[in-house]
A protein has these predicted regions:
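N-terminal cap/lid segment of alpha/beta-hydrolase-fold proteins
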Residues: 1-56, 105, 177
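Short beta-strand-to-loop junctions in surface cap/lid or active-site-entrance loops
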Residues: 46-57, 117, 124-126, 201-205
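Short beta-strand element of the alpha/beta-hydrolase
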Residues: 58-67
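Catalytic nucleophile-loop/oxyanion-hole region of alpha/beta-hydrolase
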Residues: 73-77, 95-130, 260-265
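Short amphipathic alpha-helix adjacent to the substrate-entry channel of hydrolases
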Residues: 75-93
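Primarily recognizes the serine-hydrolase "nucleophile elbow" in alpha/beta-hydrolase
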Residues: 114-184, 191-196
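The feature captures the conserved acid-bearing segment of alpha/beta-hydrolase catalytic domains
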Residues: 158-165, 171-177, 192-232, 236, ...
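C-terminal catalytic histidine-bearing segment of alpha/beta-hydrolase fold enzymes
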Residues: 232-235, 239-281
Length: 281
């Protein structure tokens, strides 16, 4: 589903992808080999969608859309955001990661690490810089990006370079009552903590990546998960740890609005790109 807050950018992004595909550029990449998929069939659902930059040597971002266990927002969050960042001069990869019952044993973190490694290993093919890459996450995708920003739980654990910046749009900081349900759905036979059990603000350390964070005061999803312990708590943790950050809070910016056209969050992607540039200098 694509609503009015993302429709125009989504259409522009799809048209651009169709054009580059027509010009001979591959835009869809599986993340796992046939042998790896045979060993774990759910890996077939992990893919990268590539939106090339106009100029070689551009920095790249990986976009993690939100999901509702059975639906992920590659169109609303992925393609529209890819187009907005493309307009700012970046290369963008929208990640389709495993969700729902396929997301057990930290599968989404594995997918993200595999995506980063794949882009890094093929940087010449994609024409991208390997320095200061961004993770841009919406909602539960923002929670994934936030966990991955921690060295022990994320990038260091998987042996990939540290993100240059996190760009988090209405991220879930703490899943609260949903954690037992997620455990029953995804990891019934496991005792270890998994990605959904972590509170992002508790993973913020002084060496955490610079972070652009925004959320809305009228976000009902964040209110369902105890609003003060979501964005506000994450913002305090960033400040307390001395992490370079920019936090924007809007009166009219509901959950799931993506790039936010027609809301108080409109043009947030441009401001996030400016922040990214400022912390990369």
């Amino acid at each position: 589903m694509v609503d009015d807050t993302s429709a125009e950018a989504c259409a522009a992004g799809l048209n651009y992808l169709a054009q580059v595909y027509h010009d001979g550029v591959q835009v869809t990449y599986p993340l796992y080999s046939e042998e790896e998929i045979a060993a774990m069939p759910s890996r077939a659902h992990a893919e990268l969608y590539y939106c090339p930059a106009e100029q070689p040597g551009a920095k790249f971002a990986i976009v993690l859309s939100g999901n509702s266990l059975y639906y992920s927002g590659e169109l609303r969050g992925g393609v529209s955001t890819a187009w907005e960042l493309h307009e700012q001069g970046y290369a963008v990869f929208s990640l389709r990661y495993r969700i729902g019952w396929e997301a057990g044993d930290d599968a989404p973190l594995e997918d993200l690490a595999r995506a980063i490694r794949f882009v890094m290993d093929n940087a010449d093919t994609f024409g991208v810089s390997t320095e200061d890459y961004a993770l841009l996450g919406y909602s539960s995708g923002g929670q994934l990006a936030g966990v991955f920003g921690n060295e022990e739980k994320g990038w260091g654990r998987y042996g990939v370079p540290k993100p240059g910046v996190l760009l988090l749009a209405y991220p879930i900081n703490n899943f609260f009552e949903a954690k037992p349900a997620y455990h029953l759905l995804m990891d019934t036979d496991r005792l270890e903590r998994r990605y959904y059990s972590y509170t992002v603000s508790k993973l913020v350390t002084p060496d955490y990546p610079p972070t652009f964070l925004w959320y809305g005061r009228n976000d009902l999803m964040l209110k369902a998960f105890v609003y003060p312990l979501q964005g506000p708590t994450l913002a305090k943790a960033l400040e307390a740890s001395g992490v370079p950050n920019r936090v924007e809070v809007y009166d009219n910016a509901k959950h799931g609005i993506g790039i936010g056209v027609g809301t108080d969050a409109e043009d947030w992607v441009e401001r996030a790109a400016e922040f990214w540039q400022s912390v990369s200098e």
